[in-house]
Amino acid sequence: SGIGEIAAAAASQLLISVYECEMIINYGIVGGLTPEMSLAKTCVVEKVVHYDFNLKFDNDMNPVYKKGEYPDFDGEIFVELDRTLIEIALKSVPELKRVTCASADKFVDTDDERKSLHDEFGADICEMELGAIAITCKRNGVPCLSLKSVSDAIGEDYDFKAMTRIASDACVKVLVDILKTL
């Protein structure tokens, strides 16, 4: 789809509308928000928050929505991914960690930002596409699965380009194992 929420939403809607996809499987690299989310750790996302969406006040400046909440989400800020697909993924690759993802059109590159996302949303990882993909799938009634591998971790020095390749390879290996069972 390319980088960012807009490209991801457009690609997801195209796949659903034109190709009538029965499910969307998203995979890619992410930033780790906790020490447990170490470099190349691969995980399955249970829920995602699109944290830069903000309709906090109405025209009279009264609080209306929580940060990350969409008007049609019934008070929820998280979009749940498909439980059946998550269970299939975990049966195929039991060592996958279930995680919460924070998603926005923003590259998070400081430990302070990472800590803030973890503290505010309980997120384990962050990235720039899944919020849009999950929302598009939810609105179209299409199941969604997301697999992510950590390319940059909190408090670690690394060669980003090298870690991107290592994390990508780790994620693809898990994806292939899961696809064999679908």
Task: Set out the residue ranges of the language-model regions.
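Mid-sequence, gly/pro-rich, charge-dense loop/helix-turn segments that line enzyme active sites
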Residues: 33-120
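Short, hinge-like loop/turn segments at secondary-structure boundaries
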Residues: 42-44, 144, 163-165
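N-terminal catalytic or cofactor-binding beta/alpha core of small enzyme domains
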Residues: 1-55
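His/Asp/Glu-rich mid-to-C-terminal helical/loop segments that flank catalytic regions of hydrolases
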Residues: 154-182
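Short, well-ordered amphipathic alpha-helical segments that serve as non-catalytic structural scaffolds
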Residues: 11, 15, 84, 88, ...
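Short loop/turn motifs at secondary-structure junctions
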Residues: 20, 38, 97, 122, ...
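A C-terminal functional module that forms or caps the active site or interfaces directly
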Residues: 106-151, 155
